[in-house]
Amino acid sequence: MEKSWFNLMFSKGELEYRGELSKAMDSFAPSEKTTISQDRFIYDMDKNFYGWGEHSSYSNNVDLLVSSKDIRNFISDDTFFIRDSNKNSYSIYFDIKKKKFEIDNVLSDLEFLFYSYWSSSYLNNRSKGDNDLHYDPYIKDTKYNCTNHINSCIDSYFRSHICIDSHFLSDSQNSNESYIYNFICSESGKIRERKNYKIRTNRNRSNLMSSKDFDITQNYNQLWIQCDNCYGLMYKKVKMNVCEQCGHYLKMSSSERIELSIDPGTWNPMDEDMVSADPIKFHLKEEPYKNRIDSAQKTTGLTDAVQTGTGQLNGIPVALGVMDFQFMGGSMGSVVGEKITRLIEYATNQCLPLILVCSSGGARMQEGSLSLMQMAKISSVLCDYQSSKKLFYISILTSPTTGGVTASFGMLGDIIIAEPYAYIAFAGKRVIEQTLKKAVPEGSQAAESLLRKGLLDAIVPRNPLKGVLSELFQLHAFCPLNKTEIK
């Protein structure tokens, strides 16, 4: 059991902790001087510290003792030793959970000192009007004992320091429940994990705000995005989806990548109505394949994990396919394979340069061997496109690109470009470690490592990517239709 020493002075008109504060507090604002030490506290009973809660129009007449960062250490103390102006020592014990309060050694004298103060003419002459903020409903009953009052002071003290409003409680029937009970700490000062802990457990986070506040938060979720690396918040339409604080590359949807690469008003999608028919009738008890497809379609607004079409890149006609990791992890099924195959065949017939932006977890297991056959199908039409027609194909690898996509068209580009810090591999780190029982070196599957080993041609940031692609196309004799349209 931890113990703390407090020097108290009992006099006729006031009770104070020895020490100093830079200023008196009549609000919830923290004191500018928040450092604390043993024997350095003030408890001026003439100061008013207003409580909170639905029925808390009272003032508890206590000053701010410590800042909120010291709250855990303060709560963990179960026993306090005090001494009066005559140097008589007392031991005060209170159990927050049971609201048990005990004072050893000359209990009656100590109670008398408290009772004398609360019965003083200063307190009795206070206004008891409903609009008087200094009116204390606990004091109106002269029989109110010091034990209950100290309990209420301690309870209100902790509430005010943590700055929690009354609506944070999960329901109205808990309004009379002691807040301290919900902020239980261990003797070492570390927070215990408790099922009914209303402040810090994620499971009960929805209880921390009213339904109205929750709806407002949901509405603004469309405006903000959180960085995966530094966890900073930024406007969702941040330029190029690159964190402004740490430079981390955030995931982009296929539609965002199309908007980034293709000139406005020139995008013509292909095969938008092609959807999977669940060819092998793959079903799980938890969630059938068709249900997963429907859910992904509602979430992303896409029919499958790739968008294909034609457009202009700085005035140069191109065929473009962009995979979307948000749709079932960008997995490659029969629809993805068919759409990419048709795109390549169209580019071959029209002699268009080809760009495929890869972001995938690999072949889709729900379609079995049919998904694996897409690797061979796409590779075969690419062979005709590159070898027979001598056309130009650029592969852009984003994070993550793994599995069957890496083993097929992802690594078949005439020029292979990767985004900075992209995760590119055939088998994932966890699979390798579980299979070979060996640790995978950190960063060995990052784009920078692959570039050093010659598996990539370039790592290009998002900002200059469009210009780099335009120069590569012009180098291979693909010129803009109208030079005036070049940005």
From Swiss-Prot:
Its cofactor is Zn(2+). Zn(2+) binds at residues 227, 230, 243, 246. The keyword Metal-binding applies. It is an enzyme of class 2 (transferase). It catalyses: N(6)-carboxybiotinyl-L-lysyl-[protein] + acetyl-CoA = N(6)-biotinyl-L-lysyl-[protein] + malonyl-CoA. Keywords: ATP-binding, Chloroplast, Fatty acid biosynthesis, Fatty acid metabolism, Lipid biosynthesis, Lipid metabolism, Metal-binding, Nucleotide-binding, Plastid, Transferase, Zinc, Zinc-finger. It is found in: Plastid, Chloroplast stroma. It holds the Pfam family Carboxyl_trans. Its EC number is 2.1.3.15. Its main location: plastid. GO terms for biological process: fatty acid biosynthetic process; malonyl-CoA biosynthetic process. Binds 1 zinc ion per subunit. One of its GO terms (molecular function) is zinc ion binding. GO terms for cellular component: acetyl-CoA carboxylase complex; chloroplast stroma. Pathway: Lipid metabolism; malonyl-CoA biosynthesis; malonyl-CoA from acetyl-CoA: step 1/1. Residues 223-487 form the CoA carboxyltransferase N-terminal domain. A zinc finger (C4-type) spans 227-246. Belongs to the AccD/PCCB family. Component of the acetyl coenzyme A carboxylase (ACC) complex. Biotin carboxylase (BC) catalyzes the carboxylation of biotin on its carrier protein (BCCP) and then the CO(2) group is transferred by the transcarboxylase to acetyl-CoA to form malonyl-CoA. Acetyl-CoA carboxylase is a heterohexamer composed of biotin carboxyl carrier protein, biotin carboxylase and 2 subunits each of ACCase subunit alpha and ACCase plastid-coded subunit beta (accD). PANTHER family: ACETYL-COENZYME A CARBOXYLASE CARBOXYL TRANSFERASE SUBUNIT BETA, CHLOROPLASTIC. NCBIfam families: accD. This is Acetyl-coenzyme A carboxylase carboxyl transferase subunit beta, chloroplastic. It comes from Nasturtium officinale. The lineage of its organism: Eukaryota, Viridiplantae, Streptophyta, Embryophyta, Tracheophyta.
